[in-house]
Regions:
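Structural signature of eukaryotic scaffold interfaces centered on beta-propeller domains
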Residues: 96-106, 165-171
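Bacterial Sec-dependent N-terminal signal peptides
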Residues: 1-30
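Short aromatic loop motif centered on NTY/YTY
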Residues: 141-171
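Short beta-strand elements that form the blades of beta-propeller/WD-repeat-like
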Residues: 109-118
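Structural motif
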Residues: 121-130
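Terminal domain-start segments
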Residues: 27-102
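Short loop/turn segments immediately following beta-strands, especially the blade-tip
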Residues: 134-142
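A structure-centric signal for secondary-structure junctions around beta-strands
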Residues: 107-108, 125
């Protein structure tokens, strides 16, 4: 009887531990973080706007909503670890879920937010900032693995190429 109770307790402990391990390693999706994004970081879109965009993309529909300024905003890309929203003609936001080097084994993630400003392809400017998954801004860019660094640099390069194309068109 005593042995049965010990086996039962041990088995219960193992099951609870396995369940907690699975929960800790559950994949965080950028759509979940976008849904939880504080209004103060993107005041032109309400929480309902963000939810609608995610739902529209999941349904294969055009993810366009009327924003708080009376204009149109559209989510143009959504994957498990990245999304892009054309907030207005002058602002596009790209969110990337990246892994800092010191968190590779733990699986902790950081949000990279790239705001690209400009209406003319030849005059685009990007500002990059980093946030914890609780949306607390980080003071500096964390050291990232090569793959994530290349993803961010590719977006920066895209801005430079658009700038170059705009200059060439004008001549």
């Amino acid at each position: 009887m005593l042995l049965d109770k010990m086996i039962h307790k041990t088995l219960l402990t193992v099951i609870l531990f396995c369940g907690m391990t699975v929960m800790c390693h559950a994949q965080i999706k950028i759509s979940d973080l976008f849904r939880e994004m504080p209004d103060s970081l993107l005041p032109v879109l309400s929480e309902n706007n963000r939810l609608d965009m995610i739902d529209f993309m999941a349904s294969g529909m055009k993810a366009e909503v009327s924003n708080r300024l009376g204009g149109k905003s559209e989510m143009t890309m959504l994957t498990d670890d990245s999304l892009r929203v054309k907030v207005s003609d002058a602002l596009t936001i790209t969110l990337l879920l990246v892994t800092p080097l010191d968190s590779i084994e733990s699986g902790n993630k950081v949000i990279c937010c790239i705001r690209t400003y400009g209406t003319d392809e030849s005059m685009l400017q990007s500002v990059t900032s980093f946030y914890t998954i609780q949306w607390n801004q980080m003071n500096q860019m964390p050291p990232l693995n090569d793959e994530d660094t290349q993803r961010i640099q590719a977006l920066d390069m895209q801005t430079i190429l658009n700038w170059g194309r705009g200059i060439l068109k004008k001549d």
